[in-house]
Design a protein with these regions (language model features):
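Pyridoxal 5′-phosphate
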Residues: 1-250
Length: 250
């Protein structure tokens, strides 16, 4: 109910059907509500079963370690780098089939000329991230939402990424909220970038126990290294009016 992997379920599954499981793949953090997953406990439960971790959303924002993992996925575009370049970190000695065949480059794992400019841009993007400052803005935004819209439901748990605030506003529709927010000069989303434009309730929010009405009236606010106190103040200022108009429209 808090966006965290059900460890008891996983433990029971591994105990009963471990011999059938080839790989356990888990997100380091949820991209819709920001919940951080207990990766170390997943690895412990997995035992000899390989564990892959998708840390795309967490890179730079919170500590990420490869300890105990078999594979780790990273991507440049989540840290200000270009789209289309990332990294797959693999345990030493792991034999994986080649994605592309040809000249045998990169020890026959990835043939073809590498996109050197994109790779260099990825490296350049891996600079420091102001986690403490962004976390402070996130907490202020959550507090502001609660005080300005008392019946709002905060879906982001306490243990979450610095820059994600996910909130449901019962009696509204996400598309209407987006339009009204855009008219106020505020950019936000009804979910993750991967699911934007998909007109159905978020499976993440439904798994949290939200009703369909609550799930469709949800916005995700993303804060980053360039977000300011003024941005948060402006959002909190216009939010009550936006919610009132959205409810009237519905």
């Amino acid at each position: 109910k808090d966006g965290i992997v059900d460890l008891d379920f996983l433990r029971d599954l591994v105990a009963k059907r471990g011999s059938e499981i080839a790989l356990i793949s888990v997100m380091h953090s949820n991209n819709e509500i920001g919940a951080l997953q207990p990766i170390d406990k997943v690895i412990e439960i997995a035992g000899d079963i390989p564990v892959h971790c998708d840390a795309v959303q967490s890179l730079l924002k919170v500590p990420v370690t490869f300890k105990g993992l078999t594979a780790l996925s990273l991507s440049a575009h989540k840290v200000g780098g270009p789209v289309g370049v990332g990294a797959l970190v693999l345990k030493k000695g792991l034999d994986i089939p080649a994605l592309l065949h040809g000249g045998g480059q990169e020890r026959e794992i990835r043939s073809g000329t590498l996109n050197a400019p994109a790779i260099c841009a990825f490296a350049a993007a891996l600079t420091s991230y102001p986690s403490a400052e962004v976390s402070k803005l996130r907490d202020q935004l959550i507090s502001g939402i609660k005080s300005s819209v008392p019946d709002a439901l905060i879906n982001t748990p306490a243990n979450a990424l610095p820059g994600i605030v996910n909130a449901s506003f019962p009696g509204t529709k996400g598309e209407t909220l987006l339009l009204l927010m855009d008219m106020e000069g505020i950019a936000c989303s009804t979910g993750s970038a991967c699911s934007a434009g998909v007109h159905r309730p978020s499976h993440v929010l439904m798994a949290l126990g939200r009703t369909e009405d609550e799930a469709i009236g949800t916005l995700r606010f993303s804060l980053g290294s360039q977000s300011t106190q003024a941005d948060v103040d402006r959002l909190i200022e216009v939010l009550p009016g936006v919610i009132e108009r959205a409810r009237a429209a519905k």
